């Protein structure tokens, strides 16, 4: 899962505070069986069509496709996604129960690469094994961000996209009202492709890790 958010200096909508990471888009790649996920068929993207408040529509769409009672919510740096889910649960109490169930099912892809002592203690590891990386490559240069991690495991690239990173996504969303109808539609499609790329990148990394441990 991946959110794209807009950190506005001034609160725009109900329940917000300055610089809150207000979600306007998400992408999901749904893996029903291990290793079985298609770039397009198993992808869900929600994107706000305007700069008006579409957060409740986003929540409804999220709950339409994520079963709060089973499965695992994967993200890279899952604390960010969990933070947005928790904020939405506070803003929309009518969806709080299901949103918090999803919140509690969050699992960080980084835990498989970097480390998570609590997780590995539960799995029976002790001592020095809890202090070491599970995986490292010099190309990471000390960073486990998705942009650094992806090239280690896949030739998937952001270079050919019209939107290349989260900052550019914010700029496109913030300029909705400055575009012509045709340009807005073009830019919105670019946002969808970019957000989809983020979650597909996680699928690629996860599948590569599966191959490593076989």
Residue ranges and their predicted role:
Residues 1-66:
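Conserved RNase H-like, two-metal-ion catalytic cores of nucleic-acid enzymes
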Residues 2-4, 108, 198:
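Acidic active-site catalytic centers that drive phospho-/nucleotidyl reactions
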Residues 3-5, 9, 30-32, 76-78, ...:
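Active-site proximal loops enriched in glycine and acidic residues that flank catalytic Cys/His/Asp
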Residues 23-25, 104, 188:
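Active-site lining segments that contact anionic ligands and/or coordinate catalytic metals
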Residues 30-32, 89-92, 153, 209-213:
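A generic secondary-structure signal for well-formed alpha-helical elements
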Residues 42-166:
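Conserved DEDDh/DEDDy metal-dependent 3′-5′ exonuclease domain
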Residues 133-214:
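Acidic, Mg2+-coordinating catalytic module of metal-dependent nucleases/exonucleases
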């Amino acid at each position: 899962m991946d959110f794209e958010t807009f950190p506005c200096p001034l609160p725009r909508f109900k329940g917000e505070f300055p610089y809150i990471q207000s979600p306007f888009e998400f992408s999901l790649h749904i893996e029903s069986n291990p290793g079985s996920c298609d770039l397009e068929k198993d992808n869900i993207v929600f994107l706000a069509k305007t700069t008006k408040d579409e957060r409740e529509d986003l929540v409804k769409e999220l709950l339409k496709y994520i079963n709060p009672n089973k499965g695992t919510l994967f993200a890279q740096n899952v604390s960010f996604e969990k933070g947005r889910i928790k904020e939405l649960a506070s803003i929309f109490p009518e969806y709080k129960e299901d949103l918090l169930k999803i919140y509690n099912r969050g699992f960080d892809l980084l835990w498989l690469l970097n480390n998570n002592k609590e997780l590995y203690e539960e799995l029976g590891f002790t001592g020095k094994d809890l202090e070491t990386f599970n995986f490292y490559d010099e190309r990471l240069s000390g960073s486990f961000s998705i942009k650094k991690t992806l090239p280690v495991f896949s030739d998937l690239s952001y270079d050919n996209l019209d939107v290349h990173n989260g900052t550019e996504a914010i700029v496109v969303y913030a300029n909705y009202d400055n575009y012509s109808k045709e340009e807005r539609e073009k830019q919105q499609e670019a946002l969808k492709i970019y957000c989809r790329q983020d979650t597909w990148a996680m699928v690629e990394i996860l599948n590569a890790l599966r191959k490593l441990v076989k």
